[in-house]
């Protein structure tokens, strides 16, 4: 039996983490980080199948963190989806330019988030099998 995929949720607002966890916890193991610095530690420890990342955070922001994740040989293949209140085209394009595979805006629409996460986790698992 295949293990449950792990999703790392990174957001400096605990309420947002709770919302995302409630949407995804039935199908995924959820771990979380409240800062970019903590996220790097948790990502190395948990080896997530997908990362949901907020943009606006103190310290290392989401764009910087995505660059760091994509530059890390152990984490560069983990898909990153930005989940943020920044809904303008420029923010979305910037997120995709730094390595995110997708971009969803808050407030989160549960069915959309579930489908996007499922699609990207399935694609990652297929890529991993081919490697």
Name what the model sees in each region:
Residues 46-55:
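Active-site beta3 strand of CheY-like receiver
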Residues 58-59, 76, 88, 106:
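The feature encodes the CheY-like receiver
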